[in-house]
């Protein structure tokens, strides 16, 4: 790329390539078409984070325009963008020195975050913002921004700050020049991920983005501002909350990148405590109402606890016309904003059974929560069901979870269910919310309802109203719901209208059919649900059974060849089967997303499905997995296990299965297909790592996207080195073994990243790959924490574990302890593993007696009758629990 320079140019654009030649060529071509007043300066930043700052400083010296801007490969720049920006600058600024001009900016990749970064949504007119008066609108990164060139040269980037060099430069400039021109009438599309884009931003995997960033960037900036101005300007305080939020969100719950070990997490917490001490309570609680700084109330409370280094701090109730919660002299939260989350509602034996939760913002010693049926009070029974939010793998806060049973009166015309909070002698109503697929109701449509037994229920302001069900009243509410959908401009709601209409047209036919819906991964079959489906399909019981698959996957054609007819995903028939199913049998959690329903979409049909979820497991439930396998994750009614250690683990209160008779010791369906057909093959099959895979960006029912950051992970480096190790390959050749490296389904999109050789097969576990065949034909398995180890141990074949020192682990031991229960030796380096594998191959790959005894102790069964045991229990459950109430749906 050559440098383009125009005499008398108005804007110098520093172009940073993305590395994607097609994107770079497209963006660069667009820049050259912007007009003669544009000078384009190509920049070569290198791969190191500090290289971008150095390249920026070098390029800035070449800038000949009055303004300088930054563009990146893949950016979408409107035609005439810079010319139009210059016109608006001339019109708005006049003679005022406004050094920074910012358009409305959109991130071009799909993102879980839709909120613009420091842009006031309500501001739709071009304006000049004073940061002393408005802390909501200003730039924290350069893409599409125009800077006064002379001003920019006074604030070069500090390359030693790496990821933070750009923010440091902008913040220092804005601290001295607090006017920002905001032009929301122009939109700039940027492709370079920012800190808040936790699915793409590369800095998340760099330890320097954490503790060194606070110590070298944030704290010096805060201390300097305090010294210069006597206080921290509010816009800088808001930036600090945004800065902290980015790092918390990037490492919350399953997003934990495992970059920091336990000691570093404590050190990071201490560093954040120092930074928060500079901030006011109002800024921490986001009282300025900056959208990008807004988090759940518990998050702001946690930051207050961190600031004060007091983890027992709770909000105190202040009693006025409404209940307020706060700390000290700062009001943080209003009762009017509090909601009681309905996580599951059911009707059993004449009672409404409600599982719910409320945010743990206050001490239960200070308030009383209860529910009323009309004016009769019922106390909540609090439990220990999983409700934690974790950051960096450490519990940060929870919700108060509860269960309550409310008898319904058969002779009452109307019964109102209302949650109430009592504090200081005053009583306040609390509104329900329905942020669960299984909450039966939602506030999406005014006339939405749930019909059950002889009753109909619907949301009514701050309460739920239950009335005796009459066919005409049900029809009235349904038709009014159709009217709401028909009047909507949303195409989604138009499709929902057709779906609901089709359901009611076909319901008389479907209600006569008992339906079981089976699925595994949708984009791949061959797991426990398929095995159970095959067995159940052969039984004569009057139940209609369907196995859900995507027609694009090879297993679709395989099952068709074998005489089965899978249910086509997203077909009209699939939609109707899902809404009318009696049971959904799943080997993977999150039933609604796997069937194409996001939380927003399921809100339109919550009152229709009434299926009972059956878990037949993808892996063994012996680790701490309450976040994914607690009872209310999928409203699981039956949970089939292969080991007493699973039952012991799942019986802990955090899973909330006690008292529901859901846990059954039967074996796992897919074990019925495990027959030894040893073909002298070494199978390497590790599980995935959260930090090595892209987060879900579409749905759990489709394969995850390629992760461009994968090759930077220790996971890739360790296994790429292992499969290309000369000693391992030489030993396999010597003793007549082949090697197969099977990628986990979530890692399979990265198959092309691995270096190949002639002797090791790299096999994505998608397409027509069969796990069962791999298990049958392999002589020995190398794994880490993967659930496939149990399939191999079930066959009493030898295993070796690689718990590598360099790969962060996300396994938390429950009732399976590797030091005393593992089915093979545990290695911590590649060299140690290869030494052991050479010995096993030399001796014929036989399972040692010690590990055989462990397998005998772990598994309750060793036969191939698992499907039969499970089917018998399911059939009894259908007859006893489902059939008696089917006619009430």
What residue ranges belong to the model's regions?
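Conserved catalytic-core segment of nucleotide-activated headgroup transferases in glycan assembly
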Residues: 231, 525-537, 669-753, 827, ...
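Short, acidic, metal-binding catalytic loop of nucleotide-sugar glycosyltransferases
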Residues: 3-7, 26-38
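Conserved nucleotide-sugar donor-binding catalytic segment
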Residues: 128-216, 223-224, 228-231
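Conserved donor NDP-sugar-binding/catalytic core segment of glycosyltransferases
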Residues: 76, 80-118
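Short aromatic/hydrophobic "clamp" motif used to bind/position activated sugar donors
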Residues: 68
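Active-site and donor-binding regions of nucleotide-sugar-utilizing enzymes
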Residues: 354-355, 386-397, 504-506, 513-673
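Catalytic binding pocket for nucleotide-activated donors in carbohydrate/polymer assembly enzymes
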Residues: 659, 753-758, 787-859
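A nucleotide-sugar donor-handling region in carbohydrate enzymes
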Residues: 493-503, 610-611, 617, 623-718, ...
């Amino acid at each position: 790329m050559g440098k383009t320079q125009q005499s008398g140019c108005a804007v110098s654009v520093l172009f940073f390539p993305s590395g994607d030649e097609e994107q770079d060529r497209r963006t660069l071509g667009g820049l050259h078409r912007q007009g003669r007043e544009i000078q384009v300066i190509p920049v070569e930043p290198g791969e190191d984070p500090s290289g971008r700052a150095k390249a920026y400083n070098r390029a800035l010296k070449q800038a000949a325009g009055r303004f300088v801007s930054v563009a990146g490969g893949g950016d979408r720049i409107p035609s005439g963008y810079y010319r139009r920006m210059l016109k608006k600058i001339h019109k708005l600024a006049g003679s005022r020195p406004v050094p920074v001009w910012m358009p409305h900016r959109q991130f071009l990749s799909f993102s879980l975050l839709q909120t613009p970064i420091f842009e006031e949504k309500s501001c739709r007119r071009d304006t000049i913002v004073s940061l002393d008066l408005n802390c909501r609108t200003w730039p924290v990164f350069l893409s599409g921004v125009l800077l006064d060139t002379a001003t920019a040269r006074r604030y070069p980037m500090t390359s030693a700050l790496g990821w933070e060099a750009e923010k440091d430069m902008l913040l220092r400039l804005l601290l001295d020049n607090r006017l920002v021109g905001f032009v929301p009438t122009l939109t700039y599309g940027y492709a370079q991920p920012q800190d808040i884009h936790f699915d793409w931003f590369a800095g998340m995997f760099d330890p320097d983005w954490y503790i060194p960033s606070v110590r070298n960037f944030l704290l010096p900036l805060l201390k300097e501002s305090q010294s210069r101005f006597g206080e921290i300007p509010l816009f800088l305080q808001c930036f600090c909350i945004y800065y902290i939020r980015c790092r918390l969100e990037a490492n919350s719950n399953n997003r934990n990148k495992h970059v920091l070990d336990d000691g570093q997490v404590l050190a990071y917490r201490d560093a954040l405590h120092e930074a928060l001490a500079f901030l006011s309570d109002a800024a921490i609680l986001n009282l300025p109402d900056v959208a990008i700084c807004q988090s759940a109330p518990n998050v702001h409370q946690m930051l207050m606890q961190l600031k004060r280094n007091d983890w027992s701090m709770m909000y105190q109730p202040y009693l006025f016309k409404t209940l307020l919660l706060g700390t000290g002299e700062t009001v943080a939260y209003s009762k009017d904003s509090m909601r009681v989350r309905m996580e599951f509602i059911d009707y059993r034996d004449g009672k409404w059974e409600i599982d719910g939760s409320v945010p743990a913002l206050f001490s239960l010693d200070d308030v009383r929560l209860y529910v009323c049926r009309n004016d009769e009070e019922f106390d909540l029974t609090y439990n220990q069901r999983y409700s934690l939010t974790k950051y960096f793998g450490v519990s940060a806060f929870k919700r108060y979870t509860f269960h309550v049973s409310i008898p319904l009166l058969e002779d009452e015309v109307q019964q109102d269910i209302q949650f109430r909070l009592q504090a200081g002698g005053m009583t306040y109503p609390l509104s329900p919310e329905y942020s669960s697929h299984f909450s039966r109701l939602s506030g999406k449509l005014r006339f939405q309802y749930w019909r059950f037994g002889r009753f109909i229920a619907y949301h009514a302001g701050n309460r739920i109203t239950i009335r005796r069900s009459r066919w005409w009243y049900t029809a009235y509410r349904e038709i009014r719901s159709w009217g709401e959908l028909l009047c909507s401009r949303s195409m989604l709601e138009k499709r929902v209208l057709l779906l609901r209409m089709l359901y009611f047209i076909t319901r008389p036919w479907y209600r006569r059919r008992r339906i079981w819906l089976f699925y595994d991964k949708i984009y791949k079959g061959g797991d426990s649900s398929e095995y159970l489906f095959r067995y159940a399909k052969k039984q004569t019981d009057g139940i209609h059974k369907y196995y859900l698959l995507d027609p694009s996957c090879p297993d679709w054609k395989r099952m068709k060849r074998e005489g089965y007819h899978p249910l086509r995903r997203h077909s009209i028939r699939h939609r109707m089967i899902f809404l009318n199913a009696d049971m959904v049998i799943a080997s993977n959690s999150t039933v609604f997303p796997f069937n194409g329903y996001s939380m927003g979409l399921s809100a339109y049909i919550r009152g229709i499905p009434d299926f009972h979820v059956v878990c037949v497991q993808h892996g063994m439930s012996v680790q701490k997995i309450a976040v994914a396998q607690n009872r209310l994750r999928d409203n699981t009614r039956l949970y089939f296990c292969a080991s007493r250690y699973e039952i012991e683990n799942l019986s802990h209160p955090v899973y909330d299965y006690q008292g529901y008779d859901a846990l059954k010791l039967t074996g796992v369906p897919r074990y019925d297909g495990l027959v030894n057909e040893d073909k002298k093959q070494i199978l390497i099959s590790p599980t995935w790592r959260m930090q090595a895979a892209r987060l879900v960006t579409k749905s759990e029912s489709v394969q995850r996207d390629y992760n461009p950051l994968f090759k930077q992970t220790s996971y890739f480096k360790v296994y790429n080195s292992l499969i290309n190790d000369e000693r391992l390959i030489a030993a396999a050749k010597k003793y007549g073994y082949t090697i197969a490296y099977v990628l986990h389904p979530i890692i399979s999109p990265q198959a092309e990243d691995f270096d190949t050789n002639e002797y090791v097969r790299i096999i994505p576990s998608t397409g027509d790959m069969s796990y069962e065949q791999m298990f049958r034909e392999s002589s020995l398995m190398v794994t880490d924490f993967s659930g496939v180890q149990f399939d191999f141990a079930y066959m009493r074949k030898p295993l070796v574990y690689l718990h590598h020192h360099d790969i962060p682990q996300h396994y938390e031991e429950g009732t399976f302890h590797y030091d005393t229960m593992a089915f093979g030796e545990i290695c911590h380096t590649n060299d140690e593993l290869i030494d052991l594998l050479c010995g096993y191959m030399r001796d014929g790959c036989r399972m040692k007696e010690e590990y055989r005894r462990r397998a005998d102790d772990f598994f309750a069964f060793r036969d191939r009758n698992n499907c039969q045991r499970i089917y018998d229990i399911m059939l009894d459950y259908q007859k006893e629990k489902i059939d008696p109430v089917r006619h009430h749906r």
